[in-house]
Amino acid sequence: MMNRISFLLIGFALMIASPTHAQLCKLFKKKKPPVIEKPKPKKEDKNGIKPYDKVITEKAITDKGLFDVHTVDDKFYYEIPDSLFGAEMLMVTRIAKTASGIGFGGGKQNTQVLRWERDSKKVLLRVVSHEVVAADSLPIHEAVVNSNFEPILYRFDIKSIGKDSTSTVIEINKLFETDVKALGFPASRRKTYKISSMDKSRSFINTLKSYPLNIEARHIKTYNSSSPPSNSSTGSISLEISNSMILLPKKQMKRRYFDQRVGWFSRGQTDYGLDVQESKTVRYLDRWRLEIKD
């Protein structure tokens, strides 16, 4: 009897200690690898700034230089290094190709100093004037700056931020494809040919090329005219405009005062910081940085 009881107790203990079939299956079942969540794609922020690869796509053709110029289908983008915001640049506008009766190709139409600026939402292109000045060490300097506020030539949306976060991407099409008068046919000559407006459907960017110190833009402008110099049946004038923008050197050339005894081109500047206690127009010689080529 005792042996039978002992046998039953041992059997019961083994039943408790032995894993069930379900437990064995769970024990030897292959563990699934942990699920790795894919990073969510970056979304554009509240200012409409998109991820870089959503703007400058794999289809982009890039021309590296002063600004990297990206071409994506029919859109053109400037990628402006942060180090060049605030730097002064010279923009020279010429008529590269002209309609018969207007003049000759290559004639200069406008020259202006520009400065690119950026805030948190936009990029501004300003026209800089040095006609009125005062040394920044003088108390009157702030008053001179406030009375010589720089006009905004164009305002751009920020499309993206560069891959290394040290540059800003803007779309440049509208600067050259809309009627920005400072970069197109001069207002004085528009009156001569009775130009009423620019035809956007016949105006477009031809080429944009970037070099280490400058960017060369060529664009076609078509203007509606009631008195065109040639092909009057079209009622329009088409021109190819050239805009050359070059970075000005940080170290300026030494100025030379103008003297009427020497026949030389010159320009005036009103200086409010002289010791004469009044503003005075000072004339300086026009100088060109001519350097021997290696």
Model-predicted regions and their roles:
Residues 1-26:
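Bacterial Sec-dependent N-terminal signal peptides
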Residues 25-294:
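Auxiliary tRNA-acceptor-end handling modules of aminoacyl-tRNA synthetases
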